[in-house]
Amino acid sequence: MTGVADGIGRALALAFAKEGAQVAGCSRGTERLDSLAKEIEGSGHIFFAADLSQAEGVRAFFDKVQEAFGGVDALVNNVGAVLKLGNFFEVSDEDWENSFQVNLMSAVRLCRLSIPALRKSSCPRIINISSIAASHPQEIFPHYNAMKAGLSNLTVSLAQTLAEDGICVNTISPGPVWSRSWEQEVEAQGSGPSAEQAKKDIMEQTGKSIPLKRMGMPEDLTGLALFLASEQSSWITATNFTVDGGLTRNPF
């Protein structure tokens, strides 16, 4: 499981561990991984700091997983980042390349490494965390939108390739979910009452356009992810699940 230090990834790691899974989690920094290791239920989990935008980082994480567990039952590709805010004219070639490596190639490389181990599992699953930005892109951060669309397409392609192995591959596409990036925006307001008000204002303003009238929280995705990783989802593959409080209103 990647991107576990904050937000959706952290919530997923905690939820999977609560259900008895042994979690191998990766993120770039060590401080938040250390706090997760103290909070998570159960034992035998491993947490590894690596830069998954680099092939060497992906390989190092996978080797650590194999050394600790000797196999993989479910791969959750969650790591992702906007990296650069801006419209098409404000995003450079370097920004596009960085987004490609973080948001798409990290998943490609981990899938490639994990598939041989997944073939040996009795309940093999790949879950890619994309975004509604893949299907409903806005003007801002086109590089991120495009890479998330690529990740969603990778899901469908891989699902067909791996169907004969019984490996189910699905996508979860969240809408606006409170995460570290939103927290950083609040932190920019300083501490104390002003920061709390900034958080409240952001959540209220964002929630206005959502039929359920609130932003999502990371925990809103955990039930679906657990289901997709379970034996109960054995006839579900190549599917994109939108979790956005009804924001995109897509009937198909």
Where are the regions a protein language model picked out?
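Conserved glycine-rich cofactor-binding loop
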Residues: 3-6
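Short C-terminal tail/terminal secondary-structure segment
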Residues: 82-85, 136, 226, 237-252
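Active-site helix of classical SDR
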Residues: 111, 147, 155
